[in-house]
């Protein structure tokens, strides 16, 4: 007689498919991280929709197999820091096609491309970073109404707020009142259909309460002078564009202001900021002073979390240097954070990055240097991960 044993309650110790999926996910995440700088600095990223796709190269995962050795002397030993899947080489290893001199005869690594959308890229950044804490202050213009708790009942209202249980109770109460009245009059009470009436309907009374949200404004300031060539401007726009997209995704109630300047600063629309170009001299102070005036007019520091961010190549008219330093000190006093990003700075002269860091000691002054495109990701991380502590 055959005996069947039930083993359904026992879990499989190892699922190869799950392990492969895990390794594949690790490779994808590693490739995204390694290529973030290139993706974020792409000129085409500016102004793209959330469904815009970017291609990322990923090395394939090979199946385990036995291979012939190179017949070299010695035994393969590790250092103790190896991870699962790492290769341990033994003896001397000759260059046979790994990018060294001459043509090689070894099989290369298989590489394929995967696509990631701009929206998915923002999601990845969200998982990696945390924004500065938006402190709760008094709330001014950005206040959203929300349906608060139910506060009692009323006889009139909209159908979605119909209180069914209370309506049935009102009907039963009316029915019982009629029954008592008939009995008191000495009349026979016969059970018959007793329909609902308008007077039975009860609706939830909902009190509208203001929903407090963290008021935050990001002020983007960009140097649009002649020394900012097309490469620097594209890099600055990519920097601001990713920053704005990430912040819009992270917070619902956040305002944006855009300022660009040469020797004179102008407040512009978001589209103009990311697409318009100018030329001329450079007064860094003009852009910062315009931001200070904007804060005085629209964003009281007692009610708003204020985050100005400035991007420039660091070249400034020498007569404006002192005024620029003083204006940065002033805007730091009324802001939660002031970020200064210097793009592809000149190696022949001392830029404003060094002057600012020498003269400005405010804790909420954050400065970064982007010497090449791959530095963009590190600059964004530094700016976004900075937590501010107010006195």
Curated annotation (Swiss-Prot):
According to the UniProt entry, the coiled-coil residues are none
Give the signal peptide range.
none
**Pfam families, per this entry?**
DUF444
* Region Disordered, annotated ranges: 1-23, 75-107
List, alphabetically, the InterPro entries matched.
Spore_YhbH, UPF0229, vWFA_dom_sf
Q: Where is the composition biased (Basic and acidic residues)?
A: 80-92
Domain of life per record: Bacteria
Family statement drawn from the similarity comment of this UniProt entry: Belongs to the UPF0229 family.
- This chain belongs to the protein called UPF0229 protein CLH_2838
């Amino acid at each position: 007689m055959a005996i069947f044993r039930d083993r359904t309650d026992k879990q499989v110790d190892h699922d190869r498919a799950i392990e492969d999926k895990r390794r594949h996910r690790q490779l994808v995440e590693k490739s995204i991280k390694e290529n973030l700088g290139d993706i974020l600095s792409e000129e085409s990223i500016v102004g793209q929709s959330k469904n815009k796709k970017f291609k990322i190269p990923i090395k394939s995962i090979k199946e385990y197999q036995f291979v012939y050795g190179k017949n070299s002397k010695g035994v393969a030993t590790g250092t103790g820091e190896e991870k699962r899947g790492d290769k341990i080489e033994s003896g001397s290893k000759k260059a046979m096609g790994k990018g060294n001199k001459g043509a090689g005869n070894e099989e290369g690594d298989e590489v394929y491309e995967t696509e990631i959308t701009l929206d998915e890229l923002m999601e990845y950044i969200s998982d990696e970073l945390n924004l500065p804490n938006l402190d709760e202050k008094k709330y001014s213009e950005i206040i959203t109404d929300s349906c608060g708790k139910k506060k009692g009942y009323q006889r009139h209202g909209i159908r979605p707020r119909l209180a069914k249980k209370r309506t049935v109770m009102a009907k039963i109460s009316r029915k019982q009142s009629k029954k008592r009245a008939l009995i008191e009059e000495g009349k026979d009470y016969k059970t018959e259909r007793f329909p609902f009436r308008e007077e039975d309907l009860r609706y939830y009374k909902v009190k509208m309460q203001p929903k407090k949200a963290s008021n935050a404004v990001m002020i983007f300031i960009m140097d649009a002078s002649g020394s900012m060539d097309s490469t620097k401007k594209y890099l600055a726009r990519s920097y601001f564009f990713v920053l704005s997209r990430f912040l819009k995704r992270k917070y619902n109630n956040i305002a944006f202001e855009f300022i660009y300047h040469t020797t004179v600063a102008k407040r512009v629309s978001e589209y103009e900021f990311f697409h318009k170009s100018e030329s001329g001299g450079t007064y860094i102070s003009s852009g910062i002073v315009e931001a200070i005036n904007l804060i005085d007019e629209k964003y009281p520091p007692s009610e708003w979390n204020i985050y100005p961010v400035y991007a420039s190549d660091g070249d400034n008219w020498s007569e404006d240097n002192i005024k620029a330093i003083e204006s940065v000190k002033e805007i730091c006093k009324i802001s939660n954070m002031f970020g200064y990003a210097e793009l592809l700075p000149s190696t022949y002269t001392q830029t404003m990055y060094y002057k600012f860091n020498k003269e400005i000691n405010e804790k909420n002054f954050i400065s970064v240097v982007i010497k090449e495109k791959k530095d963009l990701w590190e600059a964004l991380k530094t700016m976004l991960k900075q937590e501010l502590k107010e006195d």
